[in-house]
C-alpha cells in the first residue's frame, strides 16, 4: 500500500509542478508585489495538491471515521448524478480528499472606494476580472486589506472561502472546509464547482456565479429527491428564499439612494 501511495504522489506531484512552474514563469516579469501575490497562490495550491489522498483508498481503510466515510460516499453519489443527469464530468476532480485543519481554504479581500457599493475589480490571467483578491493565508489577506485602506483609502472586507475551483487547471480535491455540510448544501457546492470547470466567461464574475448557483441549487433539490434525501428540501428552499429577499432589499436600497 505504501508503494502505491508513493507512486500516486510522485505522478501527481510531477503533474502539478509542471503546471505551477508554467504559472510562475508566466509572471516572472511582473512587479515584486504581483510576483509575491502569485507566488503565494502557487505555494498554497501546491500545498493542497501534495496533501491529497485518494478517496477510494480512504474508503477501504477500516479505521476511517464513520462520519467522513459517509460524506465521501455521498459526494461520489453527487458526482455520478452530475455526470449522468447534467453531463458534468468531474474530470478527476473531487476524487481525492485534503484535511486542511483550518476553517477556510482561502480568504478573499474585497475593496471599494469610500461610500461606493461597486467593488474594485482585479484582472488576472485565466480567471479574467473578478471583484476580489484571494489569499491562502489569513494574515496576508488582512495585511493587504490594511495596506489598501491606509495607502489608497479604500473600504475593505475580508471573507473566508470554503471552496474554490481552479477552472480545470488542476484536479480539485474534496476539502475538510466543506466536507461536513448538509446534503443539499454539499450537492449544490459540488455541482456549482463542476459547472465552473465547464463554463467560465472571463471578466463576468456575476454571470459565472449566478449561473453556477442557479444550476447547483436546482440540481441539489433534484439529487436529494432522487436519492431519498428530500426531507430537508423545504429548509434548503427557505434559506435560498431568504437570501434572494436580502439581495432584493440591497438592490432596492441602492436604487433608493441612487448609488
State each model region's role.
Residues 6-21:
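Bacterial N-terminal signal peptides that target proteins for export
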Residues 20-30:
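Bacterial N-terminal signal peptides
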Residues 31-53:
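Bacterial Sec signal peptide processing site at the extreme N-terminus
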Residues 49-64, 122-130, 198:
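Acidic/histidine-rich, surface-exposed loop or edge segments in extracytoplasmic proteins
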Residues 54-84:
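Post-signal-peptide N-terminal segment of Sec-exported extracytoplasmic proteins
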Residues 78-243:
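Acidic/His-rich structured neighborhood in mature extracellular/periplasmic domains
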Residues 236-259:
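C-terminal amphipathic alpha-helical segment
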Amino acid at each position: 500500500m505504501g508503494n502505491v501511495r508513493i507512486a500516486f504522489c510522485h505522478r501527481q506531484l510531477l503533474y502539478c509542478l509542471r503546471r505551477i512552474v508554467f504559472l510562475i514563469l508566466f509572471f516572472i516579469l511582473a512587479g515584486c508585489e504581483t510576483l509575491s501575490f502569485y507566488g503565494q497562490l502557487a505555494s498554497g495550491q501546491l500545498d493542497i495538491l501534495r496533501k491529497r489522498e485518494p478517496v477510494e483508498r480512504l474508503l477501504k481503510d477500516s479505521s476511517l471515521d464513520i462520519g467522513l466515510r459517509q460524506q465521501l460516499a455521498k459526494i461520489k453519489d453527487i458526482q455520478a448524478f452530475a455526470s449522468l443527469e447534467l453531463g458534468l464530468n468531474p474530470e478527476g476532480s473531487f476524487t481525492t480528499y485534503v484535511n486542511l485543519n483550518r476553517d477556510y481554504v482561502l480568504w478573499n479581500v474585497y475593496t471599494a472606494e469610500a461610500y461606493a457599493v461597486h467593488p474594485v475589480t482585479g484582472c488576472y490571467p485565466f480567471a479574467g476580472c473578478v471583484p476580489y483578491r484571494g489569499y491562502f493565508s489569513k494574515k496576508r489577506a488582512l495585511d493587504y486589506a490594511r495596506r489598501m485602506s491606509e495607502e489608497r483609502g479604500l473600504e475593505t472586507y475580508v471573507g473566508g472561502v470554503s471552496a474554490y475551483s481552479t477552472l480545470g487547471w488542476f484536479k480539485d480535491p474534496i476539502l475538510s472546509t466543506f466536507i461536513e455540510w448538509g446534503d443539499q448544501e454539499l450537492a449544490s457546492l459540488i455541482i456549482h464547482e463542476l459547472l465552473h470547470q465547464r463554463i467560465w466567461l472571463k471578466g463576468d464574475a456575476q454571470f459565472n456565479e449566478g449561473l453556477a448557483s442557479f444550476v447547483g441549487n436546482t440540481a441539489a433539490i433534484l439529487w436529494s429527491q432522487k436519492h431519498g434525501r428530500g426531507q430537508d428540501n423545504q429548509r434548503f428552499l427557505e434559506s435560498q428564499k431568504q437570501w434572494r429577499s436580502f439581495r432584493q432589499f440591497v438592490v432596492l436600497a441602492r436604487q433608493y439612494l441612487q448609488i
